[in-house]
Regions:
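Flexible, glycine/threonine-enriched loop-and-boundary segments that flank and lead into catalytic domains
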Residues: 241-263
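Pre-Walker A adenine-sensing motif
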Residues: 88-98
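Post-Walker A helix-loop "phosphate-sensing" segment adjacent to the P-loop in P-loop NTPases
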Residues: 124-134
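PAPS-dependent sulfotransferases, especially Golgi type II membrane carbohydrate sulfotransferases
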Residues: 1-88, 202-217, 224, 228-232, ...
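Short beta-strand segments
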Residues: 243-246, 268-270, 342-345
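PAPS-dependent sulfation machinery
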Residues: 136-243
């Protein structure tokens, strides 16, 4: 019997027992996490409302499976445990909050457009670094002198997820040592579109759009201070260096990002949306299936298209008005070329080193010969950006390529994006490894 069949049987039994209809109680989970440290366990981090909004939406809209309920509970308790540990570390060493997070680079743009590929290339420069998957899951080693096995533990957790979602590695390869997206950090305070990717939670997403992301970005800054402070300790990696961060979801909250990181340098990666929207829908479906009793690919496809049409409009607006909405667009701001650097997917794949040089040049930074050699070497190991080849059908996700082309027309024309060739009713995926 397949694993999927076993899980369906487990869901049916849990449903009959009333387990799947039980309330997901935010207050109870917070109380459990606080039981050893009292009301100040999380310091001044506001979490009650966003967690309640998330859990209510999951219960009412996502149709969580038995595995999904267990995973959600584990996730919430893990995030709360990390918040407790961060607060305890700050109480023991208040200088953590003095760590300067200077002029970080944020890579963003449409998902599946090459943002991960560019992110990895930028991280080849020795002075650049990013939070790794294992650090966002467990930012501090175990207490009590226990052996630090975080990397091995996270690799085992990822392997377990792959057993539930065998298509995932082909869409988004991930290991414990891989650079992680900012969405996983923002999720600690339960204000992250990471939850929208994993769960069908339209009411939570609508609330997040209204409430804004400033508390989440302020927390991200704080989280980076903790990681940076650990790098300064004896025996740790030397130096603070430059943070290079990445997440497509930043396009929805650029004003809040800029408020938390006033000197942020932002890179937009542009690609033909018709070539990526199908892959976004596919990835979302793959992420949701292990955790939900039912997944509707057509609803996902149309929802992702609408969402990223909004993202495209916000990128145009930020380019005109500036990421802070202050009227300072591309022609003003930080560094040599302004606050936003624009790259096209085609130029990134055709000349990866040239694309990295363009980012450095735009922000008035120097790419030294050692870094150039490292970037060139990494690019040579990933020909065509490390892209895989596959094909998806638009109809499977309720999409029509002609309608998508028209829906994204303004964005394509604004940034002068060349359409990519492909079959009329399908799109050849050449982006999984570099997404």
């Amino acid at each position: 019997m397949s694993l999927a069949a076993v899980l369906r049987i487990a869901d049916a039994m849990a449903d009959r027992a009333g387990i799947l209809s039980r309330e997901l109680d935010a207050a109870a989970l917070i109380a459990r996490a606080r039981r050893h440290d009292g009301p100040d366990a999380f310091g001044d981090i506001p979490i009650a409302e966003p967690l309640a909004r998330l859990l209510d939406a999951c219960a009412a809209e996502a149709g969580p499976s038995l595995v999904g309920r267990a995973a959600l509970r584990w996730d919430v308790l893990r995030f709360l445990g990390n918040l407790r540990r961060l607060a305890a570390e700050e109480a023991a060493d208040p200088t953590i909050r003095d760590e300067p997070i200077a002029a970080p680079i944020f890579v963003t743009g449409l998902p599946r457009s090459g943002t991960s590929f560019l992110h990895r290339l930028l991280l080849e420069a020795p002075d650049n670094h990013a939070p790794r998957v294992w650090q966002t899951i467990a930012p501090y080693p175990p207490e009590g002198g226990r052996a630090d096995r975080r990397i091995a533990q996270v690799d085992r957790q990822l392997a377990a997820f792959v057993r539930l979602a065998p298509e995932f590695p082909g869409l988004h390869p991930l290991r414990a040592a891989s650079p992680q997206e900012c969405s996983e950090i923002l999720a600690h305070v339960f204000r992250s579109l990471r939850f929208d990717s994993t769960w069908r939670v339209p009411s939570y997403r609508a609330w997040l759009d209204r409430a804004g992301q400033l508390p989440a970005y302020l927390f991200e800054r704080r989280f980076l201070q903790h990681l940076q402070h650990q790098r300064r300790r004896p025996g740790a990696e030397p130096g603070a260096g430059r943070w290079v961060l990445k997440c497509p979801d930043h396009v929805f909250a650029l004003r809040d990002l800029r408020a938390a990181f006033p000197d942020a340098r932002i890179v937009f990666v542009h690609r033909d949306p018709v070539s990526v929207v199908l892959s976004v829908a596919k990835l979302t479906a793959v992420l949701r299936r292990p955790f939900s009793r039912a997944v509707d690919p057509i609803e996902i496809g149309r929802g992702e298209s609408a969402r990223w049409q909004l993202g495209a409009r916000l990128m145009m607006q930020a380019t005109t008005d500036g990421p802070a909405g202050d009227g300072a667009g591309d022609g003003a701001g930080d560094g040599a070329g302004g606050r936003i650097c624009h790259l096209h997917h085609a130029e990134l794949v055709a000349d990866p080193l040239g694309a990295v040089r363009q980012v450095y040049r735009h922000f008035g930074l120097r790419l030294d010969p050692i870094a150039e050699a490292a970037v060139a070497g990494a690019a040579s190991r990933q020909p065509n950006g490390g892209y895989a080849h596959d094909a998806y059908r638009f109809a499977d996700y309720g999409l029509d390529p002609a309608r998508e082309r028209e829906a994204f027309r303004d964005y394509v024309e604004y940034f002068d994006i060349l359409p990519e060739l492909g079959p009329p009713r399908a799109v050849r995926r050449t982006l999984s490894r570099a997404a």
